[in-house]
């Protein structure tokens, strides 16, 4: 939520990637560019690193303590909305399959919602369209999301959203009517020692 991202000291993250060379030729002087656009579509982060040499069927890493690094993403303020982080790899030579040289991710700063799920930009609510569960789910299944933030005292829980799914081998199996759901919210009062 925006209350946890008031300025650069409260919200920032390391930027990095692993670049793969699936081709049969080594690649010299590969560069990686990372950009972030804000909710208005303006470029607010643009950094790159070059000089990566990647052998055939190998990879190279760009990360904070490695040989190749990108600056952390950090802004003076964070307007609410959806941001887009894009990584683009470039080569000095002809790339016979350039369509996999770029990948984008989005993240949302919401006015009031903390979510591990993707946020629907039209409604501002968590999107219940992607589900994760054990492949053989013959017991109860639970998931935990912990908030460890020095500014979490600014927040108060006013409600919980959840989504659920069932198998659809038989169309009627997907109906949730009559199913029991148990939502539990715990307050962790012990010291976070190793999270």
What are the residue ranges of the model-derived segments?
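Beta-sheet-rich sandwich/jelly-roll-like modules and their strand-loop junctions
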Residues: 7-12, 16, 100-191
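Short, acidic/polar linear motifs in exposed loop/turn regions
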Residues: 21-25, 40, 151, 166-168
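Intrinsically disordered, low-complexity Pro/Gly/Ser/Thr-rich segments with frequent PxxP/GP/PP motifs
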Residues: 41-79
């Amino acid at each position: 939520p925006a209350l946890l991202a008031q300025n650069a000291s409260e919200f920032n993250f390391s930027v990095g990637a692993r670049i793969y060379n699936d081709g049969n030729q080594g690649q010299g002087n590969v560069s990686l560019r990372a950009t972030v656009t804000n909710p208005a579509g303006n470029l607010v982060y643009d950094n790159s690193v070059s000089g990566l040499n990647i052998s055939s069927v190998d990879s190279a890493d760009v990360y904070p303590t490695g040989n190749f690094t990108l600056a952390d993403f950090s802004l003076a303020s964070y307007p609410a909305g959806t941001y887009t982080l894009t990584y683009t790899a470039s080569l000095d030579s002809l790339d016979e399959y350039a369509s996999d040289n770029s990948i984008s991710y989005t993240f949302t700063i919401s006015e009031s919602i903390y979510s591990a799920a993707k946020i629907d930009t039209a409604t501002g609510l968590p999107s219940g369209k992607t589900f994760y569960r054990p492949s053989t789910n013959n017991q109860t299944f639970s998931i935990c999301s912990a908030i460890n933030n020095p500014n979490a005292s600014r927040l108060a829980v006013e409600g919980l959203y959840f989504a659920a799914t069932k198998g659809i081998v038989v169309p009627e199996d997907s109906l949730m009517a009559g199913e029991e759901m148990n939502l539990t919210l715990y307050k962790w009062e012990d010291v976070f020692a190793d999270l």
